[in-house]
Curated annotation (Swiss-Prot):
GO BP term, pick one: one-carbon metabolic process
Entry's family note: Belongs to the GcvT family.
Domain of life: Bacteria
Organism encoding this protein: Escherichia coli (strain K12)
Keywords in alphabetical order: Aminotransferase, Transferase
Physiological role: The glycine cleavage system catalyzes the degradation of glycine.
Keyword Cell cycle: no
EC number: 2.1.2.10
Subunit text: The glycine cleavage system is composed of four proteins: P, T, L and H.
SUPFAM superfamilies: Aminomethyltransferase beta-barrel domain (SSF101790), Folate-binding domain (SSF103025)
Pfam families: GCV_T, GCV_T_C
GO MF term set: aminomethyltransferase activity; transaminase activity
Protein name: Aminomethyltransferase
A GO CC term assigned to this protein in UniProt: glycine cleavage complex
Amino acid sequence: MAQQTPLYEQHTLCGARMVDFHGWMMPLHYGSQIDEHHAVRTDAGMFDVSHMTIVDLRGSRTREFLRYLLANDVAKLTKSGKALYSGMLNASGGVIDDLIVYYFTEDFFRLVVNSATREKDLSWITQHAEPFGIEITVRDDLSMIAVQGPNAQAKAATLFNDAQRQAVEGMKPFFGVQAGDLFIATTGYTGEAGYEIALPNEKAADFWRALVEAGVKPCGLGARDTLRLEAGMNLYGQEMDETISPLAANMGWTIAWEPADRDFIGREALEVQREHGTEKLVGLVMTEKGVLRNELPVRFTDAQGNQHEGIITSGTFSPTLGYSIALARVPEGIGETAIVQIRNREMPVKVTKPVFVRNGKAVA
């Protein structure tokens, strides 16, 4: 039986079409995925992300532990509330999960991990935390709502009290603050400004209803996927998994190579991969009729005349741009164009950076 978040009843009241998403009953859409997508790009939309797992880590050696556990370096986190995006790797350099880590105090950090990887993540973290004496608390008492879009912060702020409004005033991206019952973070998965707000389960439904009344549109998994793909954001299990290097998933920027003497899980394997080269993640744009879909082959000829084949990891029709876009993992040597096989047709595509839309505007 699939689990329900504390907002399940609100979704059904809002007319959601519910689907099983990695063991959770989640809204796919509330009538129109396209309308929900546009609401986030032009105004404000919200997502139930309570299926994600919040893990609190406490102990005097927490920073030391996370410097070993994660490919990015939490030594960069010096201001309370600052967050960092990182891969959590296995010994062969594959991605166990991608996550966000928040720093509060020297002995208190918070992780937010994916729902699909929850059990293996918790097992991995627990196993490696033991020698460091870390106290691990899984915050199943908290729900999480992401409010995203150009007007999202202003609309969400109408629900905050004076102290909460003051706490978030001028807060830069990738920060989080505990203000009363709310943990408010300037993070998201859409390429728009907004907040991800964690709050006690028993208060989630009232907060959701108040956001609806404030003019924030409920949005489902469908719009979440088209928004994140336009923004060039990876989805675990598609752009990366335990067999794929972060170097092949456009996550090279999340690997902190310096200081050279920091030992983190997967470092040795990554250094070999960096030396020998890996595949890379690119963007694809197809303005002709048709839709680029996951797992379609991508073919190209390199400058030396050699033929290569890659694969689309995520593809969709972009509601913002009005044509099809995709992320693809391909061998080195790809030029500005490639061919994608769609059924029995060979379709020309333009090769771009793996990001298409930022703050409502085309990048590609």
